[in-house]
Amino acid sequence: MTPSKSTKFIREWLRVTAEVPARAVPGMREQDTGPMDSGRKRDGSRSSLVWDVLADVMAARVAESGRTALDVVDVGAGTGGLAVSIASRGHRVTVVGPSPDALAAARWRAAETGVTLTEVQGEASDLPALVGEPATGAAGAEGNGADLVICHNVLEYVDSPEAALAAIARVLRPGGTVSVLAANPIAAVLQRALAGKYAEALAMLPGGVTESTGASATGQATRGQASSRQAPSVTRRFTLPELTALIEGAGLRVGDAHGIRIFSGLLPGAGADLATVEALRELEDAAATCPPLRDIATRLHVLAHRA
């Protein structure tokens, strides 16, 4: 592909993906629909609560370390929407992913925004080799390792969630944070049942097997399951106890947990007018940390920290 054709392809891809709901695009994340700004009004169906949480995490790390520029690694960064937003705040961001096309799109998005990303092709389980491990006691030092690792909509697709989280733990600096966002099987059951798709809902129950992927509804993909580059369907989903167990198994301390898209995931088409959007946003934000509502959200967001 010539440079001019490649440029046109990436521009068109970014235009199309910006117009399609994130869940309709294989491997694409909610944040890839565009840069997020914690100061703008949020669409209740695409809450930027995650961004607000991350902004607080970064601000606390800056204050703690005394460094204005943090080192951030975004695993499975998609087309770079979140990575660019973080880089726009002056932080050094490395995006890691298996797809050269997605990395090229992230590079293009960064150039259009006037920021710089470091793109590295590879898998989450290879992070220590790709970005390096921090030296012992390097909590505030620049160099290898990361202050923050973004792991959003990744664990559903990797061959081994355990290996991915173990690798992430190894690249975190002491006191560093990982932000995990993953699909929730409970929400999948509710959404299908409310849509009248009872057989699909039954298959999505814990211990059931989804028809579209042949994967266990919670935690594990079946033998021979294709990776996210081969199939658009979510291969795994995690309840909050499963997600926290995975994180703790990697030697990390579990922090705050939020439910993302609790009600909007059950109300397709909600938010037709601004008043409804704002009311839904306020409800989503208030319920995000309130169990059991938090625990039925479309996606679960968990922060974890390295000691």
Residue ranges: model-predicted function:
Residues 234-251, 257:
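Short alpha-helix
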Residues 68-76, 177-208:
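Conserved class I S-adenosyl-L-methionine
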Residues 81-127:
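Class I SAM-dependent methyltransferase SAM/SAH-binding core
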Residues 162-177:
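A short glycine-rich, Lys/Arg-flanked "PGG" loop and its adjoining helix->strand segment in the class I
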Residues 44-68:
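Conserved alpha-helix/loop element of class I SAM-dependent methyltransferases that forms part
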